[in-house]
Amino acid sequence: MAQAPWDSLWLNGSLATMAAGGAAYGAIEDGAIAVADGRLVFVGRRADLPPGAEDRAASLHDLGGRWVTPGLIDCHTHLVYAGSRAREFELRLQGASYEEIARAGGGIVSTVGATRAASLDQLIASALPRLDALLAEGVTTLEIKSGYGLTIESERRLLQAARALGRRRPVDVVTTFLGAHALPPEFSGDGNGYIDHLCASMLPALAAEGLVDAVDVFCETIAFSLAQATRVFEAARGLGLPVKVHAEQLGLLGGAALAAGFGALSADHVEYLDEAGVRALAAAGTVAVLLPGAFHMLRETQRPPVDALRRFGVAIAIATDCNPGTSPVTSPLLMLNMACVLFRLTPEEALAGLTRNGAKALGLSDRGVLAPGLRADFALWDIGHPAELAYALGLNPCHAVVRAGEPRPPRAPF
């Protein structure tokens, strides 16, 4: 009986499969990858390929001795916005704190004004260069949050822009509604009133339009309380939407544990997370998403509790947190380095945070690891060892990217 054909076969490379529990990086030397219908159908040693494998493939590709990793997954971005907050950067360098700037009307609210004034086309055009920078460093899936509109019309426009970016470029975009990002001017002094409006009108309408894949809340003393976050999570649960949270960045409030109680996909930032919060994440299977770009830009000193996260088996993801105020970063490779240097992750842990655990933070079980049956999303790297991705700064060693089995336009011919 004839075997089913393969669309492509990739030979002569080393594979960092990022499979858990085996060799470091899940490494396979002299590896081979076979693809059919956008899925991986063989991942292993070339010597273990079945007889006639090369004749079975419609196309053969020589990896040229390069390393191959899963496509990178940036699980936390605010990629769509208008305006700049470079002036706030200057103010922080002069001693102003993030909280002081926010309470004085800067921060998120200042971006809201510029974003509300931008058209859909303008939002897409401004985000495309940021997206292209991520793609150039091997990203095949990313999350994009709303949260810079804070009215139903402008939040809709942000989510529509995010969806459009996924059509304009060869990348999968997961959308997150972050209407509970800051208090809009129209509801000044009335946080509960805004949450009423968000839960009763904004979220149901946008979810009904198919624009929302998940729901997030900024749960901090300068943003929304535990009680307000609870109401948003309950509304999301009622609509069948998963939740996540910005929590424990500026102090210990309990937002991460609260979100874990709702089975949250992730709790993000978590610099001030305590052991009880870590235990809650572990019990719920909630991912801790570390954001070293914001930590660096805000010159924070309280590091996330990495040792406790390891001890209790909490999956650790990392992301760019690309946003105009606290992490204007479009380099996932830089985040690998920062996660190691600032948070003391190992290079392998950091890479797992941008692959396997990044996928988990988005609720995606079909990617993030090179394994048969999963999506054929992978990146080719001109490196001698996977640790070089976190080690070297400035050069981009990404040779090419394959998404759903289809090569994206490479920087160099195969």
From Swiss-Prot:
GO biological process, one term: L-histidine catabolic process to glutamate and formate
Entry keyword Disulfide bond: no
InterPro entries reported in the protein's UniProt record: Amidohydro-rel (IPR006680), HutI (IPR005920), Metal-dep_hydrolase_composite (IPR011059), Metal_Hydrolase (IPR032466)
GO CC annotations, alphabetized: cytoplasm
Cofactor binding description: Binds 1 zinc or iron ion per subunit.
Keyword check for Isomerase: no
Catalytic function, reaction form: 4-imidazolone-5-propanoate + H2O = N-formimidoyl-L-glutamate
Residue positions binding Fe(3+): H76, H78, H246, D321
GO molecular function terms noted in the UniProt entry: imidazolonepropionase activity; iron ion binding; zinc ion binding
Annotated residues for binding of Zn(2+): H76, H78, H246, D321
EC code(s) of this entry: 3.5.2.7
Cofactor: Zn(2+); Fe(3+)
Record-listed N-formimidoyl-L-glutamate binding positions: Y148, N323, G325
Class of this enzyme: hydrolase
Main subcellular location: cytoplasm
Listed pathway(s): Amino-acid degradation; L-histidine degradation into L-glutamate; N-formimidoyl-L-glutamate from L-histidine: step 3/3
Keywords per UniProt: Cytoplasm, Histidine metabolism, Hydrolase, Iron, Metal-binding, Zinc
One Pfam match: Amidohydro_1
Residues involved in 4-imidazolone-5-propanoate binding: R85, Y148, H181, Q249, T326
Locations listed in the record: Cytoplasm
Function, as annotated: Catalyzes the hydrolytic cleavage of the carbon-nitrogen bond in imidazolone-5-propanoate to yield N-formimidoyl-L-glutamate. It is the third step in the universal histidine degradation pathway.
Family: Belongs to the metallo-dependent hydrolases superfamily. HutI family.
Protein's name according to its UniProt entry: Imidazolonepropionase
Taxonomic lineage from the root: Bacteria, Pseudomonadati, Pseudomonadota, Alphaproteobacteria, Rhodospirillales
Gene: hutI
